């Protein structure tokens, strides 16, 4: 039980750090993080589109982030590495944030989702799924799922080959949740299948 509680605690801590960095580094095109314990402390890899925003002038910003991770989140001797995202169209967190920003600007949810899927697929993704949930058109909350191509749903391929991201859009009707799953072009399944090109599909479910 002690080991289970430790992993739960560490998982919650990583989630809180992720939420903080998402807000703090939004202009940098934040795309997630990876935290690993090392003999020297804690290695924190931050994935962004624009590394300069994270490093700051003379390294000021990255030193500030290091202090916050150590003092506010109790990370032991955090060592931050900043890694540039090579292709943001395959980073689900970046795409979820972009979609949420489009919704906040007043773009209709269906138009925003279709545009995102077309852009992601045209860059070579094997599959993409977008789910937008909340009060989309009226008082009743519902969830709309848009998808094209192939996304692994279960087993090791779903855990290792699929990029997943989540963001929130704050609108007058309330908060919308945006979930994005992307299977990049280099994802290879154990039992390779041929993917037949299909148009974007849509499903609606009441909440």
From Swiss-Prot:
Q: Which SMART domains match?
A: KH (SM00322)
Record-linked SUPFAM superfamilies:
Prokaryotic type KH domain (KH-domain type II), Ribosomal protein S3 C-terminal domain
Q: Name one GO biological process term.
A: translation
GO cellular component: a single term = cytosolic small ribosomal subunit
Ribonucleoprotein as UniProt keyword: yes
Membrane-spanning residues where? none
Would you indicate the residue range of the signal peptide?
A: none
Tell whether Acyltransferase is among the UniProt keywords.
no
What are this entry's molecular-function GO terms? rRNA binding; structural constituent of ribosome
Q: Which UniProt keywords apply?
A: Ribonucleoprotein, Ribosomal protein, RNA-binding, rRNA-binding
Pfam families per UniProt? KH_2, Ribosomal_S3_C
Q: Which domain of life is it from?
A: Archaea
What region holds the KH type-2 domain?
A: 17-86
Q: How does it assemble?
A: Part of the 30S ribosomal subunit.
Q: Which HAMAP family match?
A: Ribosomal_uS3_A (MF_01309_A)
Q: What does this protein do?
A: Binds the lower part of the 30S subunit head.
State the family it belongs to: Belongs to the universal ribosomal protein uS3 family.
Q: What is this protein called?
A: Small ribosomal subunit protein uS3
Q: Which organism is it from?
A: Thermococcus sibiricus (strain DSM 12597 / MM 739)
